[in-house]
Curated annotation (Swiss-Prot):
Its EC number is 4.1.1.23. GO terms for molecular function: orotate phosphoribosyltransferase activity; orotidine-5'-phosphate decarboxylase activity. Pathway: Pyrimidine metabolism; UMP biosynthesis via de novo pathway; UMP from orotate: step 2/2. GO terms for biological process: 'de novo' pyrimidine nucleobase biosynthetic process; 'de novo' UMP biosynthetic process. This is Orotidine 5'-phosphate decarboxylase. PROSITE patterns: OMPDECASE (PS00156). Substrate binds at residues 38, 60-62, 92-101, 218, 236. Keywords: Decarboxylase, Lyase, Pyrimidine biosynthesis. It catalyses: orotidine 5'-phosphate + H(+) = UMP + CO2. The lineage of its organism: Eukaryota, Fungi, Dikarya, Ascomycota, Saccharomycotina. CDD domains: OMP_decarboxylase_like. It comes from Wickerhamomyces anomalus (strain ATCC 8168 / CBS 5759 / DSM 6766 / JCM 3585 / IAM 12210 / NCYC 432 / NBRC 10213 / NRRL Y-366 / AJ 5027) (Yeast).
Length: 267
């Protein structure tokens, strides 16, 4: 049984300040669209963020692929755009080391992710210490609420994130109700009977393409939302192959929102 409560209903009862804030943004903008913007220059990145900003609740970054990255030149303008357009930031870092190491990776180094990214994510392969390490780092460098997504399922062909691995990743998520806000997953992860309300964010969503030749497999917006996804993650479908980001941004925003309204019996 998938989640049928509305975003405002879930926000009211949710233990995570970050999740409450995200639900509020989603409701106010009528958007459950996350734009995945993987480009190589700060200029192109910021231009796409500014163009897509009105249509999204979340922007997903791989900040380490930007060749001319700097905190001052890349992150500070990104934060201003997040304020201008009212969206949150999700750095898709996919942490996968022991707690002490990820603590340093998250808070320090060249990227200082915990100082600017509202949400990040992690694999469960090293056990529950990864959650503790990331939570400690967040509390030490930021006064703003932070949230963690666990990688329970992936959209790529041949992914090993399934079965017992997925189950044990869910068990890791249960160790921290405040910091772990949900999953990167292809399906609903349950937990409501135990008092958990996890946000499900789903990559590999496309209105047109079925794959990319490199293992990515696309599913339709209506399919993933009906299956329990709360936020659809779209990348090249928004700005690749000569597409108009404004047109595609509104197209995906509308499709995602209508699928949510249908799942929650609002239409």
């Amino acid at each position: 049984m998938v989640q049928t409560l509305t975003y405002p209903q879930r926000a009211e009862a949710h233990p995570s300040p970050l999740a409450k804030r995200l639900f509020g943004v989603m409701e106010s903008k009528k958007s459950n669209l996350c734009a995945s913007i993987d480009v190589r220059t700060t200029k192109e990145f910021l231009e796409l963020v500014d163009t897509l900003g009105p249509y999204i609740c979340l922007v997903k970054t791989h900040i380490d692929i930007i060749d001319d990255f700097s905190i001052e030149g890349t992150i500070e303008p990104l934060k201003k755009l997040a304020s201008k357009h009212n969206f949150l930031i999700f750095e898709d870092r996919k942490f996968a080391d022991i707690g002490n190491t990820v603590k340093a990776q998250y808070s320090g180094g060249a990227f200082k992710i915990a100082t600017w990214s509202d949400i990040t994510n992690a694999h469960g392969v090293t056990g529950e210490g990864i959650v503790r390490g990331l939570k400690e780092a967040a509390s030490e460098v930021s006064q703003e609420p932070r949230g963690l997504l666990m990688l329970a399922e992936l959209s790529s062909k041949g992914s090993l994130a399934k079965g017992e691995y997925t189950k044990q990743t869910v068990d890791i998520a249960k160790t921290d109700k405040d910091f772990v806000i949900g999953f990167i997953a292809q399906n609903d992860m349950g937990g409501r009977d135990e008092g958990f309300d996890w946000l499900i964010m789903t990559p590999g969503v496309g209105l047109d393409d079925k794959g990319d030749g490199l293992g990515q497999q696309y599913r339709s917006v209506s399919e993933v939302v009906a299956g329990g996804s709360d936020i659809i993650i779209v990348g090249r479908g928004l700005f690749g192959k000569g597409r108009d980001p404004k047109v595609e941004g509104e197209r995906y925003r509308s499709a995602g929102w209508n699928a949510y309204l249908k799942r929650t019996s609002q239409i």
